[in-house]
């Protein structure tokens, strides 16, 4: 995080989202950068080096993968949805409480994926690869860029109560509808 003392601007950077994947040679990690001005994300980029895909957005200008416009999926029925999530590691806060909710949702959707890089999960929602994504205990650097990209692709990003406090409380739900 880099702040300029003259104006309310900060860069939010995650140089390696999906660190555990990288350590274990799992090819699912990214570099994530967002620009925040006056407490609002206004520009964002997520780069997946192994696929050479660059997802980006500027507030009010749409979302893109490289130079192609991306949009969230149009899946309407929850039972047809492919949902991404993150599961707290065994022994971490919230792990035991998370499992019953995960089981419930698993029985209601087409499929669940746990990929291990929140920024990529979010841009997958933006690109229509996932229909939704939820996770808790996230850091701002994990979700700042991806959240703008989802919104600019026509999706919605909130916390678990439907509010826009996800950057502060680390609880995020991204969906393919507004």
Regions found by a protein language model. Name each.
Residues 30-65:
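Anionic-ligand binding patches
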């Amino acid at each position: 995080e880099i702040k300029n003392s003259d104006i309310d601007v900060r860069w939010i950077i995650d140089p390696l989202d999906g660190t555990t994947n990288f350590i274990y040679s799992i090819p699912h990690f990214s570099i994530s950068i967002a620009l925040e001005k006056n407490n609002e994300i206004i520009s964002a980029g997520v780069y997946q080096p192994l696929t050479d895909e660059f997802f980006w957005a500027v507030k009010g200008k749409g979302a893109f993968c490289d130079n192609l416009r991306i949009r969230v999926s149009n899946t309407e029925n929850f039972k047809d949805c492919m949902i991404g999530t993150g599961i707290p590691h065994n022994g971490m806060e919230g792990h035991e409480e998370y499992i019953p909710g995960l089981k419930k949702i698993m029985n209601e959707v087409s499929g669940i994926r746990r990929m291990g890089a929140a920024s990529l999960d979010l841009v997958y929602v933006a690109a229509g690869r996932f229909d939704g994504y939820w996770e808790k205990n996230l850091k701002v650097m994990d979700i700042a860029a991806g959240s703008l990209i989802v919104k600019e692709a026509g999706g919605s990003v909130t916390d678990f109560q439907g509010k826009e406090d996800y950057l502060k409380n680390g609880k995020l739900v991204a969906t393919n509808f507004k």
